[in-house]
Amino acid sequence: MKRTFLSAKLHKVITTAVELDYEGSCEIDGVLLDAADIGAFEQIQIYNINNGNRFTTYTIRGKDNSGVISVNGAAAHKVNVGDMLIIAAYGVYSEKELESYTPRLCYVNDQNILTKISS
C-alpha cells in the first residue's frame, strides 16, 4: 500500500507579490525550492496563516536569493502582499520508502532568506 505524507514545507514565508493577470502558479525563490527539494511546476498546497485560506497550485522557479513569493492567477484573490504562508508539498510513499522517510522543513527570516533546514 502507498500512503501520502508531507515531503517538504516552507514555513512562514512572506508574500512579496500577487499577480492576478498571470496564468497561475506561485513563483518561489529558487534557493528555497532547492532547499525544500520542490521542483519547478510541482504541485503545492498553500496555507495562508493570516486569513485561513488553503489552496492548491504549482511552482515557478524565481530568481535565486530574491526572496520572491508571488501568488499568481486566480489564487491571487486568496492572498495579500505581506501575508504569511506555509507552502507544502506531498509525496506518495511505499511502506519500504517510509522506513527512511523524513520530510524537509525549511524556515526563513522576515525577508524569506533561508535560516534553517530540518530533515
From Swiss-Prot:
Post-translational modification Pyruvic acid (Ser), affected residues: S25
Transmembrane segments: none
Primary residence: cytoplasm
GO cellular component, one term: cytosol
InterPro entries: Asp_de-COase-like_dom_sf, Asp_decarbox
Keywords: Autocatalytic cleavage, Cytoplasm, Decarboxylase, Lyase, Pantothenate biosynthesis, Pyruvate, Schiff base, Zymogen
Gene3D superfamilies: 2.40.40.20
Free-text description of this protein's post-translational modifications in UniProt: Is synthesized initially as an inactive proenzyme, which is activated by self-cleavage at a specific serine bond to produce a beta-subunit with a hydroxyl group at its C-terminus and an alpha-subunit with a pyruvoyl group at its N-terminus.
Record note on cofactor: Binds 1 pyruvoyl group covalently per subunit.
Residues annotated for substrate binding in this entry: T57, G73, A74, A75
Subunit-level organization: Heterooctamer of four alpha and four beta subunits.
Name the UniProt record assigns to this protein: Aspartate 1-decarboxylase
Organism of this sequence: Ruthia magnifica subsp. Calyptogena magnifica
Gene expressing this chain: panD
